[in-house]
Amino acid sequence: MSENELYFVIPTCRLRDVGETVEQYDEHFRRNGHTVRIIVFDDSSHSSQAKYYPQLEQTKTHNDLYYVGPREKEQFLAYLHKRLRDKRLERLVKDLFRPSYGGNRNFTLMYTLGGLMVSADDDMRPYTLMEDSPESLDADEICRGKLIKAGGNGYTRKSFDILRAFLDVLGKPVRQVPDNYERGEVLLDSATDLETNASVKLAHENSLLLRRGPLADDATVKMAQTFRSGTNDIDALDFVEMFLADESQKSLSDLNDVYVLVNFRPAVTKMNWRMDCGVAGYDNTFGLPPFFPTRLRFEDYIYRLWIQQPGIAAAHVDAAQNHCKSNYMRNPPAAEIFNEEVSNLLKRKIKSTVSRLDELTIAFDYEGEVTAEDAQEILDKISRLHARTLDAAKGAEPVRADALRVFAANLEKTFYGFEPDFFQQNLLRIVDDVVSVIKGSIELWPTLIEVCYFQKNRAGLPQTKVNNQKK
């Protein structure tokens, strides 16, 4: 695989801040001797693009920097509409690539067809936080981490050659994976539910454990990810739990705890229920399935299902990165919790009805039904959190008490006043819309892969080379 077939992509909706991400990863790649095309995929509006694109041009990089924003995306979609020549399909195409978590990532898949793609979100950084005195891992333990107070002692930044770690495994059969990789069926997180990856409860320390099982030597590593520190996979509910537990914390937007890695080692597995598209790499040589085109935070769940078919494997590579949680353009905590609860419901429903897995798509039979029991289970959980929040406000000092009461009020409003019928009605509407969009659009995906593969090799896809300064 030649270097010009390796892409580093940064999906973002925060063009204002992405320049710092670009420069840090670019410098990291230079220090490790890599030359790679960097592409920013921007979900901003035209007005935000006009306002903040000049800041991207002020960056200084060693590598060539490219940009795919609202204008380039419109050109891309216009080309697809022209090739398909069917007005009835235009809505499905727009759904696949609409501004959303999954829609923006689907552009990255098209633009990197035929190569290897390494992706990092705009709030990731090319270093990790590790404990100063790493402990040995237990047998079958792949990673251990813990929450500690931010700004304290006992941990330092460490950097690993990220691209080399991905290149060691992506697109290779398991038999060619380096010998230091552990091998097994799946990784189990001691702090999360296996199939939804949602936190079971706030855990101040967790481990990833390897479950031994069959893994074919000729299975190809199609996706991989680094480990990560900072916030790891902390759910919105976990942030609230940390806020409730820390009586010195005045605001939910403050982060007094940070996730630090104690130790880790690489592993290759048959399944991956911990898919983390924020720090992932993909073998996109022959195309991959689309991310779910949704504004809910489960766009990568399709990959956790897709990888279960024969001949495919996943890896946690020998590197780690850090997540610097940004509150800029982030939904309020109550909205994030609602997003996660709906996502977890959809994960369970879709997973239980999968009917087909193939090279580029999946199929499932779930049609979007939401029972009264489904809705009540969510309401019971959130109502308990609401009550605990109000109780905590009673004995808190004024600033913290105000923050707790505001959060409780937002929680009640977001969950439709905890009124069961009203909540179920709106939950059904949201779920039905998401499922309809997903099912309709992914059926078209293989055709679009074929169209884009031809055009990319013939004339390229619309993108702008950023006129920034070279180091």
What is each of the regions a protein language model found here?
Residues M1-Y7, G33-T35:
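A short, charged/proline- and glycine-enriched loop
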Residues I10-C13, E20, Q24, I38, ...:
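Terminal low-complexity segments of carbohydrate-biosynthetic enzymes
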Residues E23-T35, Q55-K60:
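Short, acidic, metal-binding catalytic loop of nucleotide-sugar glycosyltransferases
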Residues S48-G114, E131:
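Active-site-proximal specificity loops/subdomain of glycosyltransferases
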Residues G115-L129:
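Short beta-strand-to-loop acidic/aromatic patch adjacent to the donor-nucleotide binding site
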Residues R144-R274:
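Extended catalytic-interface subdomain
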Residues M271-P290:
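Conserved nucleotide-sugar donor-binding
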Residues L296-I312:
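A short, conserved alpha-helix in the catalytic core of glycosyltransferases
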